[in-house]
């Protein structure tokens, strides 16, 4: 998705050096590079980024961020999926959606080493097949994540505002079916990314780029079309649905003191609703900047200053950072996840604590006995 600038191609002597920060694509968010036409110009649709404006420190900083995202995101999301599979009590409708979100996040974190390498090497060294896979995973994550969060919000809305209907709708089986539908729907974009994604050798600057390969004649049209589709279907419409759901939920929670007839169930309902709200809010905070940046760039209103270009790449990094935040949110905000995480990470300690608690409970429940002179046990 490129931000390109019209103008004549640079002479070979003025082309950026091999160690200039070109940042060729390896992500659905990074721009491709314009291919000069036969007359040596960039063509009417080609606005090319100024590589010289990008500080060489940016790849190093972003690589460090991606390394943390890779470790925390892959381990954390894998642990979330394991906990939901391992413990029967965790197989609730909400947690089935959380599993889907963790799967999408875990997949996208596996692309971090490839993208970090691209930042450091200024070229895509992994070949055409991996290029297609990485870009496809990016688009799958983009759509499955926001679709899953939207369904989680709808699920919460039904649980809070329509508790009777929730008995039929909010089941683990139906949540699994909805997750499958989300992946099938996202495949319309993910498979397109596999088909269109590919590598292109840029001999003029000695790099290999990995990006969506649109027809050269209609590049600007297809580029703009893809950006608008992503902005509308992977951001605007889902966020509007989420806002409507939570607005109705807040009104309902304010108007009713007790939702379920039981204080304990009511506390759990509000706790889970709060967890989903925080996860959704963090997602929107992390992804809004890059979506806005892409939209403004598509309309040709972006600046080419160092600050603007630096902000652009850090907005991309912020979006990927979200994939490592969700497991941390679950650990802090949900007691069931926290308990299961502790049980997995410290099994011996948790087993000893349970045994100690069990002994204390038995001591309290069982009365002490004392043998009298007749040899009969009597409670003390």
UniProtKB/Swiss-Prot annotation:
Chief subcellular location: membrane
UniProt superkingdom: Eukaryota
Lipid linkage positions (S-palmitoyl cysteine): 345
GO cellular component, one term: membrane
A molecular function GO annotation: neuropeptide binding
Residues carrying sugar: 25, 39
InterPro entries in the record: GPCR_Rhodpsn (IPR000276), GPCR_Rhodpsn_7TM (IPR017452), Kappa_opi_rcpt (IPR000452), Opioid_rcpt (IPR001418)
Biological-process GO terms, alphabetical: adenylate cyclase-inhibiting opioid receptor signaling pathway; locomotory behavior; neuropeptide signaling pathway; phospholipase C-activating G protein-coupled receptor signaling pathway; regulation of saliva secretion; sensory perception of pain
Keywords: Behavior, Cell membrane, Disulfide bond, G-protein coupled receptor, Glycoprotein, Lipoprotein, Membrane, Palmitate, Receptor, Transducer, Transmembrane, Transmembrane helix
Membrane topology term: Multi-pass membrane protein
Ranges per topology, Cytoplasmic: 86-95, 155-173, 248-274, 334-380
Residues in the Extracellular compartment per record: 1-57, 120-132, 197-222, 297-311
Transmembrane annotation, as ranges: 58-85, 96-119, 133-154, 174-196, 223-247, 275-296, 312-333
Localisation per UniProt entry: Cell membrane
Intrachain S-S bonds: 131-210
Function as written in the Swiss-Prot or TrEMBL entry: G-protein coupled opioid receptor that functions as a receptor for endogenous alpha-neoendorphins and dynorphins, but has low affinity for beta-endorphins. Also functions as a receptor for various synthetic opioids and for the psychoactive diterpene salvinorin A. Ligand binding causes a conformation change that triggers signaling via guanine nucleotide-binding proteins (G proteins) and modulates the activity of down-stream effectors, such as adenylate cyclase. Signaling leads to the inhibition of adenylate cyclase activity.
Record family assignment: Belongs to the G-protein coupled receptor 1 family.
Subunit structure: Interacts with NHERF1. Interacts with GABARAPL1.
Classification via PANTHER family: KAPPA-TYPE OPIOID RECEPTOR, NEUROPEPTIDES RECEPTOR
Protein name: Kappa-type opioid receptor
């Amino acid at each position: 998705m490129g931000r390109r600038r019209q103008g004549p191609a640079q002479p070979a002597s003025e082309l950026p050096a091999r160690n200039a920060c070109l940042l060729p694509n390896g992500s659905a968010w990074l721009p491709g590079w314009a291919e000069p036409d036969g007359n040596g110009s960039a063509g009417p649709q080609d606005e090319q980024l100024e590589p010289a404006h990008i500080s060489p420190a940016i790849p190093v900083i972003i690589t460090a961020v991606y390394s943390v995202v890779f470790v925390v995101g892959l381990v954390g999301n894998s642990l979330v999926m394991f906990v939901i599979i391992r413990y029967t009590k965790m197989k609730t409708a909400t947690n089935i959606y959380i599993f889907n979100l963790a799967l999408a996040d875990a997949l996208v974190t596996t692309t971090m080493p490839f993208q970090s390498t691209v930042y450091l090497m200024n070229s895509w060294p992994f070949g055409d097949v991996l290029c297609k896979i990485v870009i496809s995973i990016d688009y799958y994550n983009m759509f499955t994540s926001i679709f899953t969060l939207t369904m989680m919000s709808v699920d919460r809305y039904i649980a809070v505002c329509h508790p009777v209907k929730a008995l039929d709708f909010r089941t683990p089986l139906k949540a699994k079916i909805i997750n499958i539908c989300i992946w099938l729907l996202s495949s319309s974009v993910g498979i397109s990314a596999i088909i269109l994604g590919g590598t292109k050798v840029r001999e003029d600057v000695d790099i290999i780029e990995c990006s969506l390969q649109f027809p050269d004649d209609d590049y600007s049209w297809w580029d703009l079309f893809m950006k608008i589709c992503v902005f509308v279907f992977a951001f605007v419409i889902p966020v509007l649905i989420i806002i409507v759901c939570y607005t109705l939920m807040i009104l309902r929670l304010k108007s009713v003191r007790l939702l379920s007839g039981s204080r304990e169930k009511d506390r759990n309902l509000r706790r889970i609703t709060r967890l989903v709200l925080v996860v959704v809010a963090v997602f929107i905070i992390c992804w809004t900047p890059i979506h806005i940046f892409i939209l403004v760039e598509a309309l040709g209103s972006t600046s080419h200053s160092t600050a603007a270009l630096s902000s652009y790449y850090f907005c991309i990094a912020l979006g990927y950072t979200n994939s490592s935040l969700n497991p941390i949110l679950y650990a802090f905000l949900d007691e069931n996840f926290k308990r299961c995480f502790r049980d997995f990470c410290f099994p011996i300690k948790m087993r000893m604590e349970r045994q100690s608690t069990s002994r204390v409970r038995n001591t309290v429940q069982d009365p002490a006995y004392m043998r009298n002179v007749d040899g009969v046990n009597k409670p003390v």
